[in-house]
Amino acid sequence: MTDAEQTIKNQKTQEAEQSLRVFLRSENATLPTRGSVLSAGYDIYASEEAVIPAQGQGLVGTDISVAVPIGTYGRVAPRSGLAVKHGISTGAGVIDADYRGEVKVVLFNHAQKDFTIQKGDRIAQLVLEKIVMADIKQITAEELDITARGEGGFGSTGKN
């Protein structure tokens, strides 16, 4: 392989590593979209009709599989409009870089009435976040840095 061919191969590899690659598993799947040029997340769509019961939860399919860029993971986050207008939030939202199964969305309905999702509705957003892959090192209590906060948690730093 010539130097030029190797350079082109390296460029293509880098481009693939920086792309959100999406496989549409069926004709019911919709490619994720961004609401605006500066949107942090990609809207993801339901591939099926579903009803999330009042005060309940449900698992909604998207019929997509993704390959996130190296050094990132995908976080499934709520859509603000669904949260404010309908009391819908998301859960269990980590997509690891090596996961290749269908992306499914856990939805919680905090409202007092059932919420119906139609095929093609935007149900969540996928946000790519950088990660640090740190080695784990077991330490002793003496090696644990002392901080001003100490063991305070669960509201210990303020009144509200």
From Swiss-Prot:
<comment type="pathway">
    <text>Pyrimidine metabolism; dUMP biosynthesis; dUMP from dCTP (dUTP route): step 2/2.</text>
</comment>
<protein>
    <recommendedName>
        <fullName>Deoxyuridine 5'-triphosphate nucleotidohydrolase</fullName>
        <ecNumber>3.6.1.23</ecNumber>
    </recommendedName>
</protein>
<dbReference type="GO" id="GO:0000287">
    <property type="term" value="F:magnesium ion binding"/>
</dbReference>
<feature type="binding site">
    <location>
        <position position="154"/>
    </location>
    <ligand>
        <name>dUMP</name>
    </ligand>
</feature>
<keyword id="KW-0479">Metal-binding</keyword>
<feature type="binding site">
    <location>
        <position position="96"/>
    </location>
    <ligand>
        <name>dUMP</name>
    </ligand>
</feature>
<feature type="binding site">
    <location>
        <position position="99"/>
    </location>
    <ligand>
        <name>dUMP</name>
    </ligand>
</feature>
<dbReference type="InterPro" id="IPR029054">
    <property type="entry name" value="dUTPase-like"/>
</dbReference>
<feature type="binding site">
    <location>
        <position position="104"/>
    </location>
    <ligand>
        <name>dUMP</name>
    </ligand>
</feature>
<feature type="binding site">
    <location>
        <position position="155"/>
    </location>
    <ligand>
        <name>dUMP</name>
    </ligand>
</feature>
<dbReference type="GO" id="GO:0035863">
    <property type="term" value="P:dITP catabolic process"/>
</dbReference>
<feature type="binding site">
    <location>
        <position position="149"/>
    </location>
    <ligand>
        <name>dUMP</name>
    </ligand>
</feature>
<comment type="similarity">
    <text>Belongs to the dUTPase family.</text>
</comment>
<dbReference type="GO" id="GO:0004170">
    <property type="term" value="F:dUTP diphosphatase activity"/>
</dbReference>
<dbReference type="Pfam" id="PF00692">
    <property type="entry name" value="dUTPase"/>
</dbReference>
<dbReference type="GO" id="GO:0035870">
    <property type="term" value="F:dITP diphosphatase activity"/>
</dbReference>
<comment type="function">
    <text>Involved in nucleotide metabolism via production of dUMP, the immediate precursor of thymidine nucleotides, and decreases the intracellular concentration of dUTP so that uracil cannot be incorporated into DNA.</text>
</comment>
<comment type="subunit">
    <text>Homotrimer.</text>
</comment>
<dbReference type="InterPro" id="IPR036157">
    <property type="entry name" value="dUTPase-like_sf"/>
</dbReference>
<keyword id="KW-0460">Magnesium</keyword>
<feature type="binding site">
    <location>
        <position position="80"/>
    </location>
    <ligand>
        <name>dUMP</name>
    </ligand>
</feature>
<dbReference type="GO" id="GO:0006226">
    <property type="term" value="P:dUMP biosynthetic process"/>
</dbReference>
<keyword id="KW-0378">Hydrolase</keyword>
<dbReference type="InterPro" id="IPR033704">
    <property type="entry name" value="dUTPase_trimeric"/>
</dbReference>
<keyword id="KW-0546">Nucleotide metabolism</keyword>
<feature type="binding site">
    <location>
        <position position="93"/>
    </location>
    <ligand>
        <name>dUMP</name>
    </ligand>
</feature>
<dbReference type="InterPro" id="IPR008181">
    <property type="entry name" value="dUTPase"/>
</dbReference>
<dbReference type="GO" id="GO:0046081">
    <property type="term" value="P:dUTP catabolic process"/>
</dbReference>
